[in-house]
Curated annotation (Swiss-Prot):
Renumbered zinc finger spans (C2H2-type): 34-57, 71-93, 112-134, 143-165
Record-given protein name: Zinc finger protein 576
Primary role: May be involved in transcriptional regulation.
Compositionally biased spans, kind Basic and acidic residues: 8-20
SMART domains: ZnF_C2H2 (SM00355)
Key words, A-Z: DNA-binding, Metal-binding, Nucleus, Repeat, Transcription, Transcription regulation, Zinc, Zinc-finger
GO molecular function: DNA binding; DNA-binding transcription factor activity; zinc ion binding
Domain of life, per lineage: Eukaryota
InterPro entries assigned to the protein according to its UniProt record, in alphabetical order: ZnF_C2H2-type_TF (IPR050888), Znf_C2H2_sf (IPR036236), Znf_C2H2_type (IPR013087)
Chain's gene name: ZNF576
Gene Ontology CC: nucleus
Protein family per UniProt: Belongs to the krueppel C2H2-type zinc-finger protein family.
Region (Disordered): 1-29
Pfam families in the cross-refs: zf-C2H2 (PF00096), zf-C2H2_6 (PF13912)
Length: 170
């Protein structure tokens, strides 16, 4: 028996199910297909899911996109999981608080130095990602200085530390 509208059944739709000419009713649900976490609609691919989330659940869409993003205070460089927490914190600095983090000039390549180790970055987002590394503490002694015993989370930090010992800075 031939389907009267084969083109209609082959179209992918932004709908709960995808049309398939193989199934009698034309509706199948693929295992592992992307679906909406709010209304449990299944989509043909992630582009349809993303479009649905933007249109139907914009607050959830924005929250999902910002998941894992850190918001940095430009006065004291503390990081916060949400913009609301950052704004609340910034009020504690008072109205006269001035940013202590460097502001990039427009005439030269912008540089953003890490206040913890001095390493510089060309973008604020790179500095933010790097600062997360300082917050993650390695088990004590992972990379320890043999001269003074200071611990480092990464081998590169220990290497820079040894250079400072060699220059007599420590």
């Amino acid at each position: 028996m031939e389907d009267p509208n084969p083109e209609e059944n082959m179209k992918q739709q932004d709908s709960p199910k995808e049309r398939s000419p193989q199934s009698p009713g034309g509706n199948i649900c693929h295992l592992g297909a992307p679906k909406c976490t709010r209304c449990l609609i299944t989509f043909a691919d992630s582009k349809f899911q993303e479009r649905h989330m933007k249109r139907e659940h914009p607050a959830d869409f924005v929250a999902q996109k910002l998941q894992g993003v850190l918001f940095i205070c430009f006065t004291c460089a503390r990081s916060f999981p949400s913009s609301k927490a950052l704004i609340t914190h910034q009020r504690s600095h008072g109205p006269a608080a001035k940013p202590t983090l460097p502001v990039a000039t427009t005439t030269a390549q912008p540089t953003f130095p890490c206040p913890d180790c001095g390493k510089t970055f060309g973008q604020a987002v790179s500095l933010r990602r790097h600062r997360q590394m300082h917050e993650v503490r390695a088990p004590p002694g992972t990379f320890a200085c043999t001269e003074c015993g200071q611990d480092f989370a990464q081998e590169a930090g220990l290497h820079q530390h040894y250079i400072r010992h060699a220059r007599g800075e420590l």
